[in-house]
Amino acid sequence: MRFAPQLEQGRLLIRYKRFLADIETDSGELLTIHCPNTGSMLNCMMPGGRVWFSRSSDPKRKLPGTWEISETPQGRLACINTGRANTLVEEALRAGVISELEGFTTLKREVAYGQEKSRVDFRLEYPDGYLYLEVKSVTLGFDDSSVAAFPDAVTQRGARHLRELATLAREGVRAVLLYCVNLTGIDAVRPAKEIDPVYAAALREAIDAGVQILAYGVHLTPDEIVIDRRLQVHWLD
């Protein structure tokens, strides 16, 4: 996926009210832009840090742009726009990059399912069956470590999705959770038990129920982002 229009660069001043960020562009322009991320963004919102944003040409839009990429304190690039993850995964699925899920004949997005009335990111249909696929965008990294972690904030919604997937797996339905690690310089991902122990416990229960866990990393520059490799998944028991 190439970023279009071309991203512009600036420096972060402050993120506030969750969905807003003040930045200064390289040309000295002061802007308030949309922050498309509900997490804590622990290592992605350092004041003074480099950011890249897409500028909107829609005159009716209240904010002039959307925050897309941050440079982390570790010097990595992180795509903080969580809305990109599902598009990236769909591109990778259709290109056959995610080999574990190859062979589907139909792909459906945002399908209602489960006892808790959730919506799963993808339903893939095969000649001999189907599966449900939930995607999580990962941007949390640490100093001197190539292992990313999820989540970066307590996520009741994430735990609910795991419960739904676990229920499906117990019923004999193939259920898959895929971590899309939108952070450069990463080789593996793990549950952030120190941030959300409830989510970590739900993940262990989902694995025990038969939910398949996958993780894939990206090639990311200010010009493009694409899923390009499988990553390891580390557990904290």
UniProtKB/Swiss-Prot annotation:
One of its GO terms (molecular function) is DNA binding. Belongs to the SfsA family. It comes from Pseudomonas savastanoi pv. phaseolicola (strain 1448A / Race 6) (Pseudomonas syringae pv. phaseolicola (strain 1448A / Race 6)). This is Sugar fermentation stimulation protein homolog. InterPro entries: SfsA, SfsA_C, SfsA_N. Pfam families: SfsA (PF03749), SfsA_N (PF17746).
